[in-house]
């Protein structure tokens, strides 16, 4: 009796699955729409830190790396950027400010940065320049709080 699940057949099946996954066109959503409204930054340093650590997911200025076009990584990256833009988009600043009625935006940002939730660890592995020192984290938290207060 022939075995159906031999290592060779499993390997061939896995390769076919990877090939077929490439036909799901998530890269069509890898867009950078024009900015609606931008924050009035409290300082150029705050802006530079936000660009370095936040803008790839939380703005319409995403730099889409080559691996964002290859499945299954493209699915994860597209989902993360869409989610990041939905929660906080620096290029749609007025919408971000209007959503802070339940929990103030500066407190949300402070909590996530100080807990090490943002930027996520898997992001900083691929983007080591996004890693912020403790001083830079505090400077970003303080600068964003001032930027939010200035509206």
Can you say where each PLM-predicted feature lies in the sequence?
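Short, Lys/Arg-rich N-terminal segment immediately upstream of the first membrane anchor
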Residues: 1-7
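Hydrophobic membrane-insertion alpha-helices, especially the h-region
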Residues: 9-25
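Electrostatic cytochrome c docking/interface patches
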Residues: 29-50, 63
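The canonical Cys-X-X-Cys-His
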Residues: 50-62, 118, 140
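Short cysteine/histidine-rich zinc-coordinating motifs and their immediately flanking basic loops
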Residues: 66-72
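Extracytoplasmic electron-transfer domains, predominantly the class I c-type cytochrome c fold
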Residues: 75-126
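C-terminal capping alpha-helices of c-type cytochrome domains
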Residues: 116-117, 124-151
